[in-house]
Amino acid sequence: MASVDVSQNTSDIHFSVSAADKVAELIKEEDNSNLNLRVSITGGGCSGFQYGFSFDEQINDDDTIIIQQCSDGKSSVKLLIDSMSYQYLHDAEIDYIKGIQGEQFVIRNPNAKTTCGCGSSFSIGDEDVL
C-alpha cells in the first residue's frame, strides 16, 4: 500500500482542495469518519472505460492513498485508488466544481484519447496501456 500526502507535492495525481472539502462534507453527512473516497476505473460506458466514485471504509493492500488537507487547515481526507485504476489516472486531476450546470466531481485525465459528453467515460489508445 502506497500512501501519498499531496501537501508534499509527491503525487502524480492531483486531488484538489475543493474535492477534499466536498468529500469531508459528504462524510460528515454520513456520520462515519472511517469513510474514504475511492476512485476506480472499470470497463464500460460509451467510450470503453468509466470512472467510478464510492465511499469505502476498507483500504486494500494494492491501494494508493492520497491524503489531501481541507481548506480549514485542520482536517484531511483520503483518496483511495487501486493499482489497476492508478495506471490510467497518471497525471490526472480529481476536482469538484460548481457551475451553471450544477455541482459535480470531475476528472481531467490527460491519458484519455476521447471522452463522452457526460464526462464519466473515456477511451485510451492501445499503445497507452501500461
Swiss-Prot record:
Family, as annotated: Belongs to the HesB/IscA family.
Name this polypeptide is given: Iron-sulfur cluster insertion protein ErpA
SUPFAM superfamilies: HesB-like domain
Keyword Membrane: no
Function, as annotated: Required for insertion of 4Fe-4S clusters for at least IspG.
Keywords from the named record: Iron, Iron-sulfur, Metal-binding
Cofactor binding note of this UniProt entry: Binds 1 iron-sulfur cluster per subunit.
Pfam annotation, one family: Fe-S_biosyn
Gene Ontology MF terms in the entry: 2 iron, 2 sulfur cluster binding; 4 iron, 4 sulfur cluster binding; iron ion binding
Record-linked HAMAP family: Fe_S_insert_ErpA
Record keyword Iron-sulfur present: yes
Named cofactor requirement(s): iron-sulfur cluster
Chain residues that bind iron-sulfur cluster: 46, 116, 118
GO annotation, biological process: iron-sulfur cluster assembly
PROSITE patterns noted in UniProt: HESB
Subunit structure: Homodimer.
